Design a protein with these regions (language model features):
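Glutamate identity and glutamate-enriched acidic tracts
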Residues: 1-3, 16-19, 56, 65-67, ...
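N-terminal low-complexity, intrinsically disordered segments
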Residues: 1-39
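Detector for Asparagine
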Residues: 4, 18, 55, 81, ...
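Generic structural signal for hydrophobic core residues of well-folded globular domains
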Residues: 9, 29-32, 56-57, 92-96
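A sequence-level detector of short, solvent-exposed, charge-rich linear segments
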Residues: 14-21, 44, 68-72, 108
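Residue-level signal for functionally critical sites in structured catalytic/ligand-binding pockets
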Residues: 26, 50-51, 102-104
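Amphipathic, interaction-prone secondary-structure segments
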Residues: 32-78
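A recognition module on extended beta-rich or small alphabeta surfaces enriched in W/G with H and D/E
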Residues: 73-122
Length: 122
């Protein structure tokens, strides 16, 4: 879905799956390609963003279950440290928060570094 939108609106036919894709995803936001209420497309962007996090930071997609149900999340190793990228942008949009792909990515990198700190890994 996202690659189709990127092809039509940004002129990019393929994503790399790494940090370089953040500029391309930001163009979707900046150009207003996604409708504010289009939760599905915003969540698709979250999946692509999550794939970038997984590839760059060594996280793995898992099913996370709590009292509210099951959702997909990224986990670092077999710890209880999770990131929930799928709903990240749809929720920000819902609450009228700005979306800066690089700033969000940088914050999550710091969060993951904090996960790793007790293990003395970077």
């Amino acid at each position: 879905e996202v690659e189709n939108l990127l092809g039509r609106h940004v002129g990019v036919s393929r994503l790399e799956g790494n940090e370089a894709d953040l500029d391309v995803l930001q163009q979707l936001v900046t150009k207003g390609v996604l409708a504010k209420d289009d939760v599905r497309d915003w969540q698709a962007v979250g999946v692509v963003f999550g794939d970038i996090l997984a590839n760059e930071l060594g996280l793995a997609w898992v099913s996370y279950e709590d009292e509210r149900g099951v959702s997909k999340a990224l986990r670092w190793r077999k710890t209880m440290n999770f990131v929930f990228p799928i709903t990240l942008f749809s929720k920000r949009n819902q609450f009228n928060q700005s979306i800066d792909m690089h700033a969000i990515y940088a914050k999550l990198v710091k969060d993951v570094e904090a996960f790793r700190a007790p293990f003395h890994l970077r």
